[in-house]
Amino acid sequence: MKKASIITYGCQMNVNESAKIKKIFQNLGYDVTEEIDNADAVFLNTCTVREGAATQIFGKLGELKALKEKRGTIIGVTGCFAQEQGEELVKKFPIIDIVMGNQNIGRIPQAIEKIENNESTHEVYTDNEDELPPRLDAEFGSDQTASISITYGCNNFCTFCIVPYVRGRERSVPLEEIVKDVEQYVKKGAKEIVLLGQNVNSYGKDFKNGDNFAKLLDEICKVEGDYIVRFVSPHPRDFTDDVIEVIAKNKKISKCLHLPLQSGSSQILKKMRRGYTKEKYLALVDKIKSKIPGVALTADIIVGFPGETEEDFLDTIDVVQKVSFDNSYMFMYSIRKGTKAATMDNQIEESVKKERLQRLMEVQNKCSFYESSKYKGRIVKVLVEGPSKKNKEVLSGRTSTNKIVLFRGNLALKGQFINVKINECKTWTLYGEIV
C-alpha cells in the first residue's frame, strides 16, 4: 500500500483541513503515516500568519530534497503559504509537484493522478473562488474532539493580517449541514465539538435567511448527548448580546471565551482597523462577566505594532490587568508582506519589541496564577483526555473553562466527564482528586 505523510503548520483550521487531506489520501488508497522517510507522498499544510512560518517551510522543503531524489516522493504544499506564493514556490523549489490553495484541496486526487501518470510535471491550483471548499467528513481522533469549520475566509482586513488575501472573502456553511455534522460526530463518540472560523461570530452575515451565530449555537446545543462546545476565534466587535445570552443559558457551551485584544491602545486599535476602542472592549468584558459568572477569558495580543509608543503599550498592560485574562497568546509584531501595516512608518525596533513582550508576559503570568488560584477547594466537571504527557500514571483533563486538571484515575475514564476536587493550583495547571 502506498503511504502519505501530512505535516501541519499553523492554526486549528489548518489542523482540521489536514484531517480532510488525510481523508482524501485514504480514499485514494493511501496509508497515512507520520514516517516521512517511507512516504510516497508528503504534503505540507502551511501557514503564513507569522514571519517565522516561511523559514520553517523552506527548511522542511530543503530536508525533503533527499527523499525526492531517493524515492521520487510526490511533494505537495497546501494552505495559506501555498495560496500566497503560488507558482513562485515551484520556481524556488523545483522538487514541489503540487501547490494547492486553501479552497482547492478537493482537486488533490486529479493532481496526484496527473503526476503519477507523468501527464504533468507540476500542478498549481490557487484559485480564490467564492464557493465553499468541499465538505469532507474528517475522522476525529482518539482524543474525542471533532472540529468543524463553520466559516471560511475573512472580511475584516486588519492592517497586520494576511488572512483575507489568502483565504478569500467570508463564506458561511449552511446551518443545517453544521448541525448534521455535530449529530454524526456525537453519535460516533465525540465529547468535544470545536467550531472553527477566522471570525466565527460573524457567521451568517452572508445569508439572507436570518441564521446567525447565536442561532447556530442554540441549534447545536439541542443535539442530544453529553459533550462540550468550544469555538475559535470570535471578534470582539461582533460579540453581540444574543450570543452572550445563548452562551450563558447553555451548559454545553464552554465558559472559556477567546476575545482577541491585539492592543489596549485605542490609537493602535484604529491603525489596526479592529473596529473597537479600549473602552468598548472593557465594556464588553464587563457585560460578559456579569452575564456569565465564572467565565474565563483569553486573548491574542501584539506588541510593537508600528507607531506603538510606551503610553500605548501601557494601555495594553492596563487592559490585561483590568480584565485579568486566564491566558494570553502574546506576539511581537512581524511584518507580513502585502498588508497595510508592512508599509507604515515608525516600525518598532526588535529590542523594544522583545523588552515589551517580556514585561507583558510577566503581567499575564501573575493574572494567570491569580485566576487559577480561585479553583482551590472547588469541585469541577472535567472531560478526561487521557494520560498526562509528563506522567503516564496521571490522567489529564479540561474544565469547561479550559483549565488543565491532573489527577489519578483509571485510563478507562478517558472520554468521560467526571467531578474532580481541586487541591492545588499552579499557573497553568490544577491538581486534584476524583470525587
UniProtKB/Swiss-Prot annotation:
Keyword check for Transferase: yes
Pfam family, one: TRAM
Compartments where found: Cytoplasm
Binding sites annotated in the UniProt record for [4Fe-4S] cluster 1: C11, C47, C80
Residues reported to bind [4Fe-4S] cluster 2: C154, C158, C161
Radical SAM core domain sequence ranges: 140-370
GO molecular function: 4 iron, 4 sulfur cluster binding; metal ion binding; N6-isopentenyladenosine methylthiotransferase activity
Keywords: 4Fe-4S, Cytoplasm, Iron, Iron-sulfur, Metal-binding, S-adenosyl-L-methionine, Transferase, tRNA processing
TM segment ranges: none
Top-level taxon: Bacteria
PROSITE patterns from the UniProt entry: MTTASE_N, MTTASE_RADICAL, RADICAL_SAM, TRAM
EC number: 2.8.4.3
Record domain TRAM: where: 373-435
GO cellular component: cytosol
Subunit text: Monomer.
Protein name from the UniProt record: tRNA-2-methylthio-N(6)-dimethylallyladenosine synthase
Species whose genome carries this gene: Fusobacterium nucleatum subsp. nucleatum (strain ATCC 25586 / DSM 15643 / BCRC 10681 / CIP 101130 / JCM 8532 / KCTC 2640 / LMG 13131 / VPI 4355)
